[in-house]
Amino acid sequence: MYNRIISYLEKFSIPHNHQFGFRSKHSTTHALLLLTDKIQRSVDNGTYSCGIFLDLCKAFDTVDHKILLAKLEYYGIRGVVHDWFASYFSNRRQFVSLFGTNNYSDYQIVTCGVPQGSVLGPLLFLLYINDMPKCSNTLEFHLFPDDTNLFFNNPNILNLETILNVELEKVTQWLFANKLSLNIEKTSFVVFHSPQRWIAHKLNLSSSSMSVKSVNQVKYWGLIFHSNLN
């Protein structure tokens, strides 16, 4: 089933172009090179750029089955295959066992989430967040399971802040509509700029439901990005 679905998705170019997780010819290396190039170009042009690094809280476990099935249908996965996925999600059960004992909890019906460790789980999650970039025509999105980057640049630091706060609210509303939440402690932003260009204004980024912390550097996909890109 995985091969059939991935072949169909790639044939009709359904995955977002900056969707880098679990796709052929779209590795994290490509994502890192793309982001680094964007930042470097911004610094060379004398503009300010901001990377907002989102960390989704229990991303795979909170996927809403009804929303996911609706998205599968939207992407053209219908008929027998759609029914197969509906059956795949129905009546899934889980229980908790105490290690080293024969004590087990009662079975509970699983109403959300995609199976972690499965072949289909990551692919289904990528389809679940595939339409996130549609919530903003201003931001550039780099998508990866539970680790998404938003990028924007502007020559004026005050305009950068104003626009980002407006767009961040759109992202927050998308997350709410799709029943996903951010790990606030691990979500942060970095303002990238030339070492010779001092920032007189400290950015404050927030939405109606959260405030994003500012940091001088962030570790993203194993690479540390510093505000001066040094």
Language-model regions: role of each:
Residues 4-17, 122-152:
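Active-site palm subdomain of RNA-directed nucleic acid polymerases
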Residues 31, 35, 124-128, 164-167:
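Hydrophobic alpha-helical membrane-association signature
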Residues 40, 93, 133, 169-176:
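Structural signal for well-ordered, non-membrane alpha-helices
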Residues 102, 166, 181-216:
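Short, conserved micro-motifs composed of acidic
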Residues 1-115:
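Conserved pre-catalytic core of RNA-dependent polymerases
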Residues 59-75, 149-176:
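Catalytic palm subdomain of template-directed nucleic-acid polymerases
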Residues 19, 49-59, 85, 113-121, ...:
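Catalytic palm active-site di-aspartate
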